[in-house]
A protein has these predicted regions:
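Conserved, mostly hydrophobic/aromatic
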Residues: 6, 18, 41, 48, ...
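Generic structural signal for well-ordered alpha-helices
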Residues: 45, 68, 72-75, 113-117, ...
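Terminal-tail/helix-coil boundary detector
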Residues: 1-2, 207, 231-266, 281-285, ...
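Glycine/proline-rich, positively charged
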Residues: 26-27, 33, 94-196, 200
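Aromatic-lined glycan-binding groove of carbohydrate-active enzymes
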Residues: 197-235, 270
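Structural preference for beta-strand elements that scaffold enzyme active sites
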Residues: 13-17, 54-55, 84-88, 124-127, ...
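N-terminal binding-site loop/beta-alpha segment at the start of enzyme catalytic domains
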Residues: 1-85, 151, 355
Length: 355
């Protein structure tokens, strides 16, 4: 297990982060993500800690607080020293029917953080993340509230999830101007079947030294191979039969799985492990969040850290999963093709370059 720097902070987190969306499952998507009880959740956390995972991610909205409760109880029951684990949670989702029980307003943030601390049985949250982009709250209001929490010692660092690149830049511009705590991490969907963030978010995160925390690296289990016919896999309905998320191009995803299978066979590992290794080996990824419904699934995912794909294997997967560049990226690439001098004579005029 390697440890990577969390954004521009001095904190280090394991390259694998345990996700807790499978804990409880009550009142959350009808339990289709997972329905682990306290004993089962505790065993997953214990196994993760044994594998030297020091990073756990949850959210107040997961099972309407039950996931946070179970996480906190597990850490207490296991006698985990608080400084040995980096605890991350999130705020935004609807926790009650009232008009202000959702969002990234100062009111909702301040109301929510104390409840999260209570459920987690801790006096501080290491990484407090705004779970979604709020179209109705000014960014400065959100950033001021988060900075107040940092100054009060209730949270240590600020992160966001599912935000647009421009909004993160705006947030940190405000933070720099006002002396607020900056956004240090972005939790984003990324997988072989979902590479959207490479176009805008990745260049921004690399330029600004913002950590990338990846959720759903297997695209809701699709890249485990159990939905794609062929090979030795048995096609199963799985989670996507009831909750078809995140959205993917299933024809392309099937082609990706078909490319994953021979690589997995060559290494003697599961298809899922290869897909996770591809994500983990991307230089901009700080930590990959994995969830599990049982210990066997968790153990297979944890073993991804011991698998290193060759440059040729990565190139093969890059090619089969490539997405068409969006504007203005294709235009910038086209017009920078001859930007770097090669030493060869420059030809002026003539036909335009090919697309």
């Amino acid at each position: 297990m390697k440890y990577n720097r969390l954004g521009n902070t001095g904190l280090y987190v394991s390259e694998i982060c345990l996700g807790t969306m499978t804990f409880s499952g009550q009142n959350y998507f009808g339990g289709v993500i997972g329905t682990l009880n306290q004993k089962e959740a505790t065993s997953l956390i214990e196994r993760s800690l044994e594998a030297r995972v020091n990073f756990i991610d949850t959210a107040n909205v997961y099972s309407l607080g039950e996931s946070e409760k179970m996480t906190g109880q597990a850490l207490k029951d296991l006698g985990v020293k608080r400084s040995d684990v980096v605890l991350a949670t999130k705020v935004f989702g609807r926790m009650a029917p009232g008009p202000n029980d959702i969002g990234a307003s100062r009111g909702h943030i301040m109301d929510s953080v104390s409840l999260s601390l209570e459920r987690l049985q801790t006096d501080h949250i290491d990484l407090y993340q705004i779970h979604q982009s709020d179209a109705r709250t000014e960014v400065e209001e959100t950033m001021r509230a988060l900075d107040d929490l940092v100054r009060q010692g209730m949270i240590r660092y600020v992160g966001v999830s599912n935000w647009e690149a421009w909004k993160i830049m705006k947030a940190n511009g405000i933070a720099d101007k006002r002396g607020f705590a900056r956004v240090e991490t972005m939790q984003a969907y990324y997988s072989l079947a979902g590479r959207d963030l490479e176009q805008d978010l990745v260049p921004m995160m690399q330029d600004q030294t913002i950590g990338c925390l990846v959720w759903s690296p297997l695209s809701g289990g699709y890249l485990a191979g159990k939905y794609t016919p062929g090979g030795d896999a048995k096609v199963e309905p799985g989670r996507r039969a009831n909750f078809d998320f995140p959205p993917i191009d299933k024809e392309q995803a099937d082609r990706i799985v078909m490319a994953l299978r021979p690589i997995a066979k060559a290494h003697g590992v599961s298809v899922a492990r290869v897909a996770l290794a591809w994500v983990r080996q991307k230089p901009f990824v700080t930590s990959t969040i994995i969830g599990a419904k049982d210990l066997s699934q968790l153990n297979d995912n944890l073993e991804a850290v011991s698998l290193t794909l060759s440059p040729q294997e990565i190139a093969t997967l890059d090619e089969v999963s490539a997405e068409r560049p969006q504007y203005p990226h294709w235009m910038a690439k086209r017009n920078n093709a001859t930007r770097v001098p090669t030493g060869e004579p420059v030809k002026m005029g003539g036909p335009p370059p090919k697309n």
